[in-house]
Amino acid sequence: MPANNSLLIFRDEINNIDKKIVKLLAERKNLVFKIAQSKIENNQAIRDIEREKKMLQKLIFLGKKYNLKSEYITQLFQLIIEESVATQKKLLKKFCNHNKLIPANFSFLGPKGSYSHIAAYKYADLNFQKCITNECSTFEEVVLSVENNQSDYAVLPIENTCSGSINEVFDILKKTNLFIIGEINIFINHNLLTLKKIELNKIKTIYSHPQPFQQCSDFIKKFPEWKIKYTKSTADAMKKIKKYNDVTNAALGSEIGSKIYGLEILMKNLANKENNITRFILLNRNPKKISKNIPTTTTLIFTTGQEAGSLSKVLSILQEKKLIMKKLTSQKIYKNPWEEMFYIDIQVNLSSTLMQDALEKIKKITRFIKILGCYPSEKITPIAP
C-alpha cells in the first residue's frame, strides 16, 4: 500500500475517533445539566472537590494502563471539570437570578470601545436585561459615580496575565466604601490600528493607555523610532487617531473599538503572551450574599504588625482551616515604607463557619483588616490529583 494511502487511512480513523469524543462530551454535558437540576432541587453545593480528586486519581491510574502520562490526563480532565462547573453555575444563576428583568447602569473607564466597556457589556449580558453605560475619564471617577448614586456598578480592571496587578486600583480599593460583588475575565487582543492601511515604517506616533504598552513591550521595542503617547484609555487613543486625521498616527486597541471608530487593523494579537487576560471586578454600594451552592471568592486587605513572621501566621490560619488562597499581592504603604498592605483572594464563602472562624483569628494578629467583598468565582481553581 502506498505511504500516502496508509496516511489517509490513519487520519480517517483519527477523525472518526475525534467525532466519537465530541459526541461523548455532548452526552456528558447533558448529564451535567441533570446533575445541576438535582443539586438545585436538593440544595447541594455545585462543586465537590473531594469527589473531583478521587475521580482524577482513578482516571490517572486508568491512563497509566494505556500508557498515557498523568500530566496529560490531569490537564484534559481539569478542563472538562471546569466546563462542567461553569455549566452548573450558569443553570443555578439562571434559576436564582431575578435581575434579568431589570436594566443596570455601569460606570467604566471610557470612552466606548475600551476594554472596560467590553467587560461591562459582557457582565451585563449575563446578569441584566439591559446595560446603561456611564463613561468616565479616571478610575477614581468610575468609583465616585457609584458612591454618589450616579451609577449602579463600577467596572475596574484589577490584574492582567502579562503586566500583573494594577496598583492604582488596589489604592482605590483601600479607600472606597464600595464592595466587590462580581468578577469577569476578558481576553485582551491588542491590535495596531491606523486610519488606513499603511507600511509600518510610515508610522511616527503611537497612542494608548500605559497598560497595553507594557503588555505589548516586545512588539513596541522593534520600533524605537516611534513616539509613544499615553492616553487615559485604549478607546481614548482610538478617538484621538480619528480626530487628528493623521495617517502617520497609530493606536493599540481592541477590534470592537476599531469598528466603533472606523479604523483599520494593521496587525493583530500583539501582546507578549498568547493568553492575555484581564480580570475585572464589579463594585456596588451593598455587599452581595451568595448562595453556598456557588463557587465563591472572598477578598480581604490587611496589614500586619512589623514583627517577623506576621504574614506567615495569617497564612497558617488559612492552611489550618483548609482554605484555598487564590491570590496574594503585597503593596508598600505610602509614608510607611517599612509596612505592607496585603490583598488576598480566598476560595470560600464569607458566611461559611470556616471563614468566620479564620477571620476571628486573623483579626487578632493584624493591625488593619477590611473585607472587600464576597462574590461568585468566574474561574474555578484547578484541583490537584
UniProtKB/Swiss-Prot annotation:
Protein name: Bifunctional chorismate mutase/prephenate dehydratase
A GO CC term assigned to this protein in UniProt: cytoplasm
Database matches in Gene3D superfamilies: 3.30.70.260, Chorismate mutase, Periplasmic binding protein-like II
Domain Chorismate mutase, first and last residues per copy: 1-92
Organism: Buchnera aphidicola subsp. Acyrthosiphon pisum (strain APS)
Domain annotation Prephenate dehydratase: ranges: 105-285
Function (record text): Catalyzes the Claisen rearrangement of chorismate to prephenate and the decarboxylation/dehydration of prephenate to phenylpyruvate.
Main location: cytoplasm
